[in-house]
Swiss-Prot record:
Residues 17-392 are virion surface. Belongs to the influenza type C/coronaviruses hemagglutinin-esterase family. It is a single-pass type I membrane protein. Residues 1-16 form the signal peptide. Residues 267-379 are annotated as: Esterase domain 2. Disulfide bonds join 44-65, 113-162, 197-276, 205-249, 307-312, 347-371. InterPro entries: Capsid_hemagglutn (IPR008980), HEMA (IPR042545), Hemagglutn-estrase_core (IPR007142), Hemagglutn-estrase_hemagglutn (IPR003860). This is Hemagglutinin-esterase.
Length: 424
């Protein structure tokens, strides 16, 4: 406790001279080992090809365009590419992963599988999907999308049962009913294999409700069976509703292996694409920037729901998205958030990114990295810092040595001057 006055004095000095080192609302990185996944707001190729030299289209500083650390596609998102025919192969690797995408699948698109479907279910799917992606990218370096080969021994082909507007679901694939089967009360199987990745994120989906076809109602039932380990993953329809339901998806994390997709009723589904996860790393939280439209369009908060501590830091602007290129591209607030990618930062926390790792007037919550040491401000003008006293002790020693040197020099010159006057 005898050191507390010194701590108070040092903190008071820091505050007096204006060194606050507050957390800043940006995404950043510790070093050069980072990667960003995005959409048109970070798609340098889109700007070059479609809007030459007009970089106001983006929220990303153009200086980062040649970094080789960005995988972005205008009009797309990882979720959209994962499930639908509108595909872009998002691929990237880094110790520190940043996501700024998701806006290209929102309530504004109003997607639902059938005319009596429910877009709310798809927003739920989006949240569950990104939860798995964020959790896994906190412990994996590499993400890419891969095709999943499957073998179905019947003659029926995949059907575009689930579509809305320009979006057509192709993952999982729906295998149509065989021509010689009279109704949907039948068992169907297909083999699929996962190889080449450490782990995979694959969809397992069902219609959770009573599906009507030719005056009959059916309950969906889907399973994946790992033929190597004997583990089975399954979903059965549990709802009795006949309208307002849609395609409920769970996102399984599976190892490499040989699998059997099984349907006991309705149509067989089999995964055709997977998130490929490779190269395990030391746990490093991902950073997610809110991806939303201008208020004139309806957005959702599913990336925020998916981004939870301790595996994810969420960054957002406090104001409406208002772009300078158009209302949905080039917002100053989000450009400011992405500006942190221009420099290294030592510490990440719930409140934001700290630029320096020495001291701060704000105590970092859920800190990660080399973070400043500080405590809560208990009065309006006196932050009480609690940290290792060694730097202060060393500073005191240096100041003491400096004072001694100055005194010695003063005495030397005073004596020397006195001698000169004596001889003069």
């Amino acid at each position: 406790m005898f050191l507390l006055p010194r701590f108070c004095l040092v903190c008071s000095i820091i505050s007096t001279f204006g060194f606050q080192n507050p957390p800043t609302n940006v995404v950043s990185h510790f070093n050069d080992d980072w990667f960003l996944f995005g959409d048109s707001r970070t798609d340098c190729n889109h700007v070059v090809k479609t809007n030459p030299r007009n970089y106001s289209y983006m929220d990303l500083n153009p200086a980062l365009c040649d970094s080789g650390k960005i995988s972005s596609k205008a009009g797309n998102s990882i979720f959209r590419s994962f499930h639908f025919t509108d595909f872009y192969n998002y691929t990237g690797e880094g110790q520190q992963i940043i996501f700024y995408e998701g806006v290209n699948f929102t309530p504004y698109h109003a997607f639902k599988c059938t005319s009596v479907g429910n877009n709310d279910i798809w927003m739920q799917n989006k949240g569950l999907f990104y939860t798995q992606v964020y959790k896994k990218m906190a412990v994996y370096r590499s993400l890419t999308l891969v095709n999943v080969p499957y073998v179905y021994n019947g003659s029926a082909q995949p059907t575009a049962l689930c579509k809305s507007g320009s979006l057509i679901l192709n993952n999982p694939a729906y295998i149509a009913r065989e021509a010689n089967v009279g109704d949907y009360y039948y068992k169907s199987e297909a083999d699929f294999s996962l190889s080449g990745c450490d782990e995979y994120i694959v969809p397992l989906c069902i219609f959770n409700g009573k599906f009507l076809s030719n005056t009959k109602y059916y309950d969906d039932s889907q399973y994946y069976f790992n033929k190597d380990t004997g583990v089975i993953y399954g979903l059965n329809s549990t709802e009795t509703i006949t309208t307002g339901f849609d395609f409920n998806c769970h996102y399984l994390v599976l190892p490499s292996g040989n699998y059997l997709a099984i349907s006991n009723e309705l149509l067989l589904t089999v995964p055709t694409k997977a998130i490929c996860l490779n190269k395990r790393k030391v746990f490093t939280p991902v950073q997610v920037v809110d991806s939303r439209w201008n208020n004139a369009r309806q957005s959702d908060n599913m990336t925020a729901v998916a981004c939870q501590l301790p595996y994810c830091y969420f960054r957002n602007s406090t104001s409406n998205y208002v772009g300078i290129y158009d209302v949905n591209h080039g917002d100053a607030g989000f450009t400011s958030i992405l500006s942190g990618l221009l420099y290294d930062s030592p510490c990440f926390s719930q409140q934001g990114v700290f630029r320096y790792d020495n001291v701060s007037t704000v105590w970092p919550l859920f800190p990660f990295g080399n973070c400043p040491t500080a405590a809560s401000i208990i009065s309006s003008d006196l932050p009480i810092c609690v940290y290792d006293p060694l730097p202060i002790i060393l500073l005191g020693i240096l100041l003491g040595v400096a004072v001694i040197v100055i005194v010695v020099l003063l005495l030397y010159f005073m004596v020397d001057n006195g001698i000169r006057q004596h001889y003069a």
